[in-house]
């Protein structure tokens, strides 16, 4: 499905605003880049690199959330960035999640979403408690009565980032059961 003219316009405006804001607020985080300075041997190029890296970071994760919302707005019942999933998690559910993630990390099993969801739904939700951590989805949308929660990550996350993200996704299932 192609983007509508309105969506394209909103995305262009968003990018322009983010870049203009960055240009207005840009302050070099550090002038000490000895390795890069020795490697490139041109302090102006190092400063340019620092600026480009800063722009790339600005246009990084937060921009994906905003663009996701722009794309989804026209075809979903509702959509939000930084959505509070809510709900509670029991000790039994937490134990089930820890077990799934440990087995995946150790290579004892392959990921199988439907099976993991069944295990979580089977785990008792009795005496569930609210948790502060892991409650926020980067992006949420509801379409035709079905809820979708998204955790947006960079390409090729390391194993620790993967583990934390997988845990969070499984916790969302437990919270919304």
Where would I find each of the regions flagged by the language model?
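Residue-level marker of positions within ordered structural domains that often coincide
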Residues: 77, 144, 174
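Acidic, metal/cofactor-coordinating or nucleic-acid-engaging core segments within structured domains
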Residues: 131, 156-177
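Short, well-structured alpha-helical interface segments that form or flank functional binding sites
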Residues: 54, 58-67, 134-136, 160, ...
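Surface-exposed cleft-lining segments at the edges of enzyme active sites
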Residues: 52-55, 122-128, 152-160
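Conserved catalytic cores of phosphodiester-cleaving nucleases, focusing on short active-site segments
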Residues: 72, 137-156
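Active-site metal-binding core of divalent-cation-utilizing nuclease and nuclease-like domains
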Residues: 83-144
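Nuclease-adjacent, charged terminal/linker segments that flank catalytic cores
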Residues: 1-89
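Generic detector of short, locally flexible boundary/turn motifs and exposed helical patches
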Residues: 17, 21-22, 34, 44-48, ...
